[in-house]
């Protein structure tokens, strides 16, 4: 069973669901529950003819407490949170300052989720849209010039989880998030992630970390910044802003699950852009806590609502079994280095429905992820001669 809320997708394994349901025999007389006469209780599969008005049924009993407990752990635990509060002001230097975090609260209605699950299972459906109550944060904008330009309330939130990241990747994500904190997006302007990000290198505080470079995964300055661009993208995409430019990664990366919600960048060539067509300017607050990253967009909400549906996935391909090898003079002769993991391929599509007043528009986001083999580089002598196989250290 799959549970969805916005871009979040949760799965409950079949073996867990099996324990939720038991079956029992029930008897009724003209629609009322009865205890059947002893003569009608028989061993085996054959039941004697029933008197008029008496019916025998097999009914399902659902263990709602067990279901609620499972959904609490799998769904509510990662989603539920309390609403925050923030005071937005300007410092003496004119810089925008945030005191607090205007993150909205969420509560999964577990009782309603259990009932929806029962209906879905009894009807043979495999997906439940979670009933989630949202709680608005308290936002105080002290600076009058910001209020005059429409900075009044929370408009959109982008979030992602980078659990399992390396130390350098976590560092780069933190540095990248700070570049956008306090960034102001005028009304009717086009926001460019790459332009706002600026230079990426050791002088701007970044470390080398794995980055997708063509058909390889190699260390480069700023590895992990796609976590920041993906977080920024999810917020405006889910809020219904027009997306001008967005590209998925060439292969599926688990940090950006569910697939089809990522936005890769590689300055200066690959960017993420959107148009602020809202009721006023937008102001960004960025934040990270633990392994979660957030983009909060403050502004003035208009009458638009947005709904995202997906992902629809197909063309699932296993990773190639053969190992890809490339010979290079960048490594010492005989040195062996892994530059690509085995990755399965797939295609994914999301639909977005944006409603304004009496009208609505539907757009789709398509992503194609390559299936990739295990990939090694092997060092060769500068003459270009390839070393014999027995001269290569397989443990390197």
Task: Please tell me what each predicted stretch does.
Residues 2-11, 15-50, 61, 65-396:
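Well-ordered beta-sheet/strand-loop patches within structured domains
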Residues 53-54:
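Noncatalytic, helix-rich "gating/capping" subdomain that lines the substrate-entry/channel surface
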């Amino acid at each position: 069973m799959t549970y969805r809320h916005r871009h979040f997708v949760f799965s409950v394994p079949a073996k867990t669901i099996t324990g939720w349901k038991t079956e029992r025999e029930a008897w009724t007389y003209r629609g009322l529950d009865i205890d059947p006469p002893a003569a009608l209780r028989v061993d085996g599969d054959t039941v004697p003819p029933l008197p008029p008005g008496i019916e025998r049924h097999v009914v399902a009993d659902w263990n709602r407490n067990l279901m609620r407990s499972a959904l609490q752990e799998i769904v509510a635990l990662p989603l539920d949170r309390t609403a925050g509060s923030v005071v937005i002001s300007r410092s003496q230097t004119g810089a925008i300052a945030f005191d607090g975090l205007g993150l909205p609260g969420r509560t999964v209605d577990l009782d309603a989720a259990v009932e929806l699950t029962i209906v879905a299972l009894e009807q043979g459906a495999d997906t439940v849209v979670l009933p989630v109550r949202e709680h608005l944060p308290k936002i105080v904008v002290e600076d009058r010039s910001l209020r005059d330009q429409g900075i009044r309330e929370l408009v959109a939130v982008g979030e992602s989880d980078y659990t399992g990241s390396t130390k350098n990747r976590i560092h780069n994500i933190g540095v990248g998030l700070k570049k956008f904190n306090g960034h102001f997006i005028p009304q009717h302007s086009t926001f460019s992630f790459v332009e706002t990000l600026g230079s990426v290198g050791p002088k701007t505080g970044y470390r080398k970390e794995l980055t997708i470079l063509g058909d390889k995964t190699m260390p480069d300055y700023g590895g992990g910044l796609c976590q920041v661009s993906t977080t920024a993208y999810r917020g405006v995409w889910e809020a219904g802003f027009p997306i001008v430019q967005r590209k998925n990664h060439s292969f599926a990366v688990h940090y950006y699950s569910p697939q089809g919600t990522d936005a890769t960048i590689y300055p200066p060539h690959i960017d993420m852009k959107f148009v602020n067509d809202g009721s006023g300017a937008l102001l960004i607050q960025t934040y990270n806590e633990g392994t979660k990253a957030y983009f909060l967009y403050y502004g003035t909400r208009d009458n638009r609502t947005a709904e995202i549906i997906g992902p629809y996935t197909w063309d699932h391909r296993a990773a190639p079994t053969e190992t890809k090898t490339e010979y290079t003079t960048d490594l010492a002769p005989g040195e062996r280095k892994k530059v690509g993991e085995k990755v399965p391929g797939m295609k994914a599509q999301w639909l977005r429905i944006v409603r304004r007043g009496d009208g609505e528009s539907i757009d789709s986001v398509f992503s194609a992820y390559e299936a990739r083999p295990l990939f090694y580089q092997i060092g060769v002598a500068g003459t270009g001669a390839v070393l014999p196989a027995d001269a290569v250290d397989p443990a390197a």
